[in-house]
Amino acid sequence: VAASFYDIPLADGACDTIVMVRVLHHAADVPATLRELRRILRPGGTLVLEHANKRHLKAMLRYAIRRGASPFTPEPYEYAPLNYAFHPAYLRRHLAEAGFAIEEERAVSIFRLALLKRLAPARLLVALDGLLQRPLAPLRLTPSIFLRCRAAGDARQPSPGRPLFRCLRCHATALDSDRPDRLLCRACGTAWPITDGIHRFR
């Protein structure tokens, strides 16, 4: 599916699990993105979310020698055009406001230093990273953080045959393929093309 994560063409509660890795740092409006993820995730569903950490150790050291922006302020830091790092507290607050509860956290990319990669074998660094992800998670000092979150609500088994897509124009869920190259909204008549197997909602 090709679409915007601010307006996802999926029906409410269409997903059991959502995985968003190396994506959120491109979101200029994090609250809107998280609200949309919560909308398409069924109550009790799981969100696995990775985010760039503004408050990582290297950023703190750079700030200490006055070579970088403050990693302690809550607002997102745009380190390149449309590339953002987020303070852990900022993201936790907006996850809670969107209706998510964090169940597990992992510190990732602990050894993201060019010098270490030259001095130590990649397999060793990967193994050490895996061992330290949980113990170091409470410190939140790594460049990347993974979160496993639960969507609020009664985690009942979803009903079979629930709709998958939602029309972006009228928000109806009565869409079907009247032809192999499109999805047609029966409510408003909008045709959404399918090209090379990709549903295009743009």
Regions flagged by a language model, labelled:
Residues T46-P71:
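Conserved class I S-adenosyl-L-methionine
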Residues R66-A69, R93, E97, E103-R179:
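A C-terminal cap/extension of S-adenosyl-L-methionine-dependent methyltransferases
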Residues V19:
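A conserved beta-strand element that flanks and buttresses the S-adenosyl-L-methionine
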Residues R22-V23:
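Short catalytic micro-motifs in class I SAM-dependent methyltransferases
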Residues S70-Y90:
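Acceptor-substrate binding/catalytic loop of class I
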Residues C170, C185-T190:
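Short Cys/His-rich metal-coordination motifs, predominantly Zn2+-binding knuckles/fingers
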Residues P31-T46:
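A short glycine-rich, Lys/Arg-flanked "PGG" loop and its adjoining helix->strand segment in the class I
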Residues V1-A11:
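Conserved SAM-binding strand-loop segment of SAM-dependent methyltransferases
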